[in-house]
């Protein structure tokens, strides 16, 4: 199919942004992971699930390309002078996969936004960031805040180590998941200097027994769940996500913690990424793990996240997206794989359900 898409190089886009930035819509067709690692300032990440892609059969609707109602309304009203599509490094649109995000986005725009000129960025983000780094935003190295730690460890943080050492999950500081979302342990939540240095304005305490140390200084949200295979953490997902969004919309930052910042709080962060960015669990897991390598939601929480994935990515396609987590509970199933992530709580299922796991189950302190 011949599509009326113009070509811009890095210099052309730079000139366009300097002259008419407010009338230029940048649609970044790379993965969520790549987009968050670095992107052109003001660009919007285009993502949709595999099931939505398959059901579209090559003709994706504009509501999937630009899900934001306000942006889509402006686009259809002709408020944008130009829409620029980009991927990582493609030299030409002709080389894009026919069922790939870039080609589907171009097709939808040419069909439904005919009043706006559509361009393809030659060389993609890679070429533009090399030529115009000042117009790009790159995430800093995913490490926690480096502040001096006291030699004493709170009684609530059992380390299993000598009394004079700091457990791994309390070392460093809270890690940045997104610019407004941080993850860490109960110890970090007790360090007002760390929280203030990061600009934290609210905390989500995902535990039944960790205290809220500074209720007069920060806004708190309590999610009183235990870290065991009986706990229903998924019933809190939407409430936690809405809380995070409310703090973000107010210009604040949220720190999510449990006891060790390994299982419960990590689960909440994963659920947030999955729903708000429409990404699969494995992609969200890898994204968070690169920032806090010790995350390890327990077996049950992983199952609940998989069920949440099927709801988030295909709300109207439940028959096609049944949760693999249910395979573990169905004694008659022949499924051989559930997920490939380490989990923190040892599970003792019946009927040889352990055979479904490809990764070893590790143990850790209550987290």
Curated annotation (Swiss-Prot):
Domain Tyrosine-protein phosphatase: 173-314
Subcellular localization: Nucleus
GO CC, alphabetical: cytoplasm; nucleus
Pfam families in the cross-refs: DSPc, Rhodanese
E.C. numbers: 3.1.3.16, 3.1.3.48
Post-translational modification: Phosphorylation at Ser-359 and Ser-364 by MAPK1/ERK2 and MAPK3/ERK1 reduces its rate of degradation.
Protein family per UniProt: Belongs to the protein-tyrosine phosphatase family. Non-receptor class dual specificity subfamily.
Induction field: Exhibits night/day variations with a 100-fold increased expression at night in the pineal gland (at protein level). Up-regulation is due to a large degree to the release of norepinephrine from nerve terminals in the pineal gland and cAMP signaling pathway.
MF GO annotations: growth factor binding; MAP kinase tyrosine/serine/threonine phosphatase activity; mitogen-activated protein kinase binding; phosphoprotein phosphatase activity; protein serine/threonine phosphatase activity; protein tyrosine phosphatase activity; protein tyrosine/serine/threonine phosphatase activity
In-chain residues carrying the UniProt-annotated modification Phosphoserine: 359, 364
Name this polypeptide is given: Dual specificity protein phosphatase 1
All copies of domain Rhodanese, residue ranges: 20-137
